[in-house]
Amino acid sequence: VPTPTLLFVHGALVRDGAWWWSPTADLLRERTGVESRAVTLPSCGETDGPGAARGGDLADDAAALRLALDDVAAAGGSAVVVGHSYGGTVLAEAGAHPAVEHLLFVSSYLPDVGSTQGSIMSTEPDPVTIRPDDAGRIVLDGYDVESFGARFLQDADAATQRAAWERTTAQDLRAFGTPTGAAGWSGVDSTAIVCTDDRSTTVGLQRRHAERATRSVELPTGHHPFITRPDLVVEQIAAFLR
């Protein structure tokens, strides 16, 4: 059986997916031979193409994932697609693709058709504070490196927290307001990882969405287990690849 390619779709308000996924990418390659690629999201300003200046909405982010999946399919391969947090909403929009072998949701969402990222987050008792800027984007509001680290990466060291903070970015407001047009997780083999020490997304919200996955597993980590416990994440990926 050919080894699939792993595509990683990062969460909201950050850039450089390759950096976020790299601790797991390295261990995954070593243990399974699976190579990883990060999908760049136009809504986070991550494109060098003609659309870079205009940002993008959920549909543009989904198109970026579809393009990456088309590349995998053109090479005769299959893909495992990982969505972290907001990335799961991108998977819902674009996950029903012939190249997809498995979807992995990490502290994430499996939304119904017509859901918006903004409405999903608004149900949280202590939502991440954001504000609009003057360019049609939203930015994190009221955080510094210490408070960001304490909320999103409390199980990482200070150097990692700082490197993560330096990769936060503004995101196109439309990404939070675009209703999903598909439930791409439906009918696709999937795993949901619930992070039980997550200080960003409540365990209750994670569990409600995880019930929709083919299987779910709970890990004792903060919001970014692929940084802090790559061994546990690789263990889960290896399990469904067997």
Where are these regions (language model features)?
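Conserved loop-alpha-helix segment in the C-terminal half of the alpha/beta-hydrolase fold
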Residues: C195-I227, A239-F240
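Glycine-rich His-Gly loop
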Residues: F8-L13, S85, S108, C195
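Gly/Ala-rich beta-loop-alpha elbow adjacent to hydrolase catalytic centers
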Residues: V82-G87, L91
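Active-site loop/oxyanion-hole signature of alpha/beta-hydrolase fold enzymes
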Residues: E35, L41-V80, A94, G118, ...
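Flexible "cap/lid" loop of the alpha/beta hydrolase fold
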Residues: A96-L140, D172-A175, T201-T202, R208
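Active-site nucleophile elbow and catalytic-triad environment of alpha/beta-hydrolase enzymes
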Residues: A163-G184
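Conserved HGGG/HGGXW glycine-rich cap/lid loop of the alpha/beta-hydrolase fold
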Residues: T3-D48
